[in-house]
């Protein structure tokens, strides 16, 4: 039923089955397996990226040639592949769903203590982690962070990429823990 993400490599053929079922299925190719760090405090260690783009990607099934589910459609992406702009999709590998599947089916969410949340939207900019925006009334807004601020460190640990910033943040304990953030403001 499920395929293991570790068995899929760049260049492998897969099928994207979105809204409309088999009639709208699309043969695609895995063009990358890599980290995906979302600006909205979201991180996948090994997302699957496919091309060409399937227009009904949200929640679409990514299936291998043996009919095994290997991913769930998450995002439309535009990236440079072999020097050319490529439109495609990003899929959450089923491997990351399996450990929390029972919780999702029973409770509608992952159980356990919630992670710390800053309420900040970040992006990578020339080797720096920069605030893109802050959530109204969130911890970052309360602390006075503003768009354009650089996050230089979290809990005295220097951060230079968004994905690393989320990892450092989430290692600090459960939601509600006080987290020192070093900010550089121009």
Task: State the predicted function of each range.
Residues 1-25, 47, 56, 127, ...:
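Conserved active-site neighborhood of the chymotrypsin/trypsin-like protease fold
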Residues 1-2, 26-87, 116-118, 128-132:
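Active-site region of chymotrypsin-like
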Residues 2, 8-9, 63, 145, ...:
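Short, well-ordered loop/turn sites that connect or cap secondary structure elements
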Residues 8-14, 62, 151-152, 179:
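Generic structural signal for buried aliphatic residues
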Residues 11-17, 67, 140, 148-151:
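A structural signal for short beta-strand/turn segments enriched in small hydrophobics and glycine
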Residues 13-16, 20-26, 65, 69-125, ...:
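C-terminal cap/linker of serine protease catalytic domains
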Residues 51-56, 60-61, 118-153, 157-161:
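PDZ/PDZ-like domain segments forming the peptide/carboxylate-binding groove
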Residues 102-109, 130, 141-146, 152-154, ...:
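PDZ-domain C-terminal substructure recognizer with occasional recognition of PDZ-binding tails
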